Amino acid sequence: MTTGDCQTLSRRISNPYLEHSPSQIYGENSSCAGRALRNIIILQAADLVKDRVNLKGFYRRSCVGSELVDWLLEHCPFVQCRSMAIGVWQLLLDMGIMSSVDQHLYFQDNYVFYQFSSDECSYLYCEFEREEEWQKGVKLLLELVHLIPARAGICDLSHQKTEDSEESSDEILARLTSAVQRELAAVIALKARKSAIEQDDENADKHVTVTEANNGPDPQAGVMCKLQERDDIGRIELVHKLARENCQFLQTEKKESEKLEQQDDEVTMVQVKEQGQSVLVLKKVASCGPAPTSGSAENDARYVVVSGTPEKILEHLLNDLHLAEVQHKETETLLDDFLLTYTVFMTTDDLCQALLRHYSAKKYQGEEENSDVPCRKRKVLHLVSQWISLYKDWLHEDEHSKMFLKTIYRNVLDDVYEYPILEKELKEFQKILGVYRRHTVDEYSPQKKNKALFHQFSLKENWLQHRGTVAETEEIFCHVYITEHSYISVKAKVSSTAQEILKVVAEKLQRAEEDLALVAITFSGEKHEFQPNDLAISKSLEASGRIYVYRKDLADTLNPLAENEESQQRSMRILGMNTWDLALELMSFDWSLFNSIHEQELIYFTFSRQGNGENTVNLSLLLQRCNEVQLWVATEILLCSQLGKRVQLVKKFIKIAAHCKAQQNLNSFFAIVMGLNTASVSRLSQTWEKIPGKFKKLFSELESLTDPSLNHKAYRDAFKKMKPPKIPFMPLLLKDVTFIHEGNKTFLDNLVNFEKLHMIADTVRTLRHCRTNQFGSDVSPKEQQELKSYVNHLYVIDSQQALFELSHRLEPRA
């Protein structure tokens, strides 16, 4: 079988083994039984169908193979063993009712992702359509398991490698530290060696002998490649090459000149030990900093941190800092890496105490000259100023950092009389901390210590107060439910009153505010009506209940799902909006969320595994927004009862997605495309048939950018070409950070694996690059107000079951 035949074979979903349809092989009812099993999984085991991430990409609504087997064994007593359950799922895979995201031909009972198709039964009457009949379908499938083709005769496609897949492997390897790469290289080399030995035993008469001859190499003796002294045998790509070419390693005696050269060769790795224990590991790299003043080659190379204890990493960082305007690139990167990731291996209090020790130390690495004391103090102050600049208002809420800054500010006041050179750092410190009073050197003398000055600083603390308290300023998405499964999303401060939220909801529903009321209903059924001045938002309420909007003259909630004038007006409203301006307003709203995310939030999100914690508020908002935009697209389309207007809506959303891509808002772009691909929308065959060909072609091009194959290569290539400002697809960025975290240990031999933290910080700095330039909207003020009101408060249905019911109501099964 040729490569083309194998590739064609791998793409066939309906039946990957035979040229006959599933109905011809398994019978007419087999597909109905398979779809019934799929539908019951979606309805009764929705927790198994979720968005998932693995090393290759992000997959929507996927299931895990082993979990599907467990579920079938639990709910079908007549399925007696795992092999029987595997056979049932293999039938669904053969029939195209489910597919492997990795395009595997066989169902695997392990952590492999599968996705269900959204096609419906084409028969007018299906005996397995009712929920209670699905187990009969499973019994039918069990009877057909013996018809599954034997695996031995199937073409193995595992060796069909492509250039793109090799590029994807290189990208994955780039996210592994050198320690992990060396371990992989050792395993591959060992495997290659065992394979070569076995081959030599089988083909002893075909081996090639390499001999050393005085008259030169034998032309029939094969090719001997020599590894130079500086070739790194730990490099994964070198081992790959040697294994492919079936090379064997031969040890030869070094010539005298080579031995001398080796002795003169400089060390590339340095270990610092204390009491026999390694405390710091450094690696030599070529310097990318300013040109050295002297011609020494030593100045052209620097050492970067591979691993170490927290104290030694900080000590090396301070030693490496210099007080010139331009730092070496390695030093600048080390400083930024340390400040971004220090919370992984030490607390803020530990860092504060360590910095105070370095600032106040009488001796530093032995006897210190008096001239080095102010230099060391200035380095500590430089690090602190960079820390404040990077974290900004994050430090305002930490008691340890506030006390530390007060203490070190007082120490600088005490020291500036003895070391006048610190006056520049003091003024910069005062500017950062908001102390604007001017001082002279005389004022800092021990005889004139100005206690009132520090008291003034303690009382004022402008830099601590400009945001207000967390309770007053924190913003969240408040969900005001209209029915059990539909809500209006309102971005509001935690301190918002019920009247403020009700005003937004009334405007969205186009009803009089005085006719509506907000009611909190707990999951136990208790009701509490909010008064106008009550605080409506509570984190405790999020976990225990919901906020509903009621009409005061009715005992029930509003019902926007009915085919009434309100739903028609909503469709007409969006159809009358300019798609470019609507995309701009989406960009403006998303940019406000994206611009508020602190780089540190990605670190907390990855290491704490808490996506909604206090330290990841802004990141959680943007992720939630992505989900809401996807639901909004499906909601608007499925609430439109007229076929003609529904076709216009789909065209509208395709254009909005294209504009989001053009405006470099990849977060909303992905959300809209995924919303159009939602099963409840994609099944509307009558609607999609009426979409013009040029729109279908445009949508196909947009879909190609969301293709998860080869680790989202299409998206990554397009994103690299975009210039700031731009908004990345945040779930994918988080996946990259998570992959680095899970693929590399945080500690190696009780030392901080700083090489891993550097890779994480480098990925996190993507946010900084995207925000190099700021976004500005060009929408006219009058139009902007209407668009802003619409975009900021989206109306969505968050129940997949409710969306499917609407979908079947619009276009029932044939």
Curated annotation (Swiss-Prot):
Domain of life: Eukaryota
Listed name of the protein: Rap guanine nucleotide exchange factor 5
Gene3D superfamilies linked: Phosphatidylinositol 3-kinase Catalytic Subunit, Chain A, domain 1 (3.10.20.90), Ras guanine-nucleotide exchange factors catalytic domain (1.10.840.10), Son of sevenless (SoS) protein Chain: S domain 1 (1.20.870.10), Winged helix-like DNA-binding domain superfamily/Winged helix DNA-binding domain (1.10.10.10)
Organism: Mus musculus (Mouse)
GO MF: GTP-dependent protein binding; guanyl-nucleotide exchange factor activity
DEP domain location: 43-118
Keywords tagged on the record: Guanine-nucleotide releasing factor, Nucleus
Gene name in the database record: Rapgef5
Annotated compartments: Nucleus
Ras-GEF domain sequence ranges: 578-813
Annotated Gene Ontology cellular component terms: nuclear body; nucleus
Residue span, N-terminal Ras-GEF domain: 301-434
Pfam families, A to Z: DEP, RasGEF, RasGEF_N
GO BP terms: small GTPase-mediated signal transduction
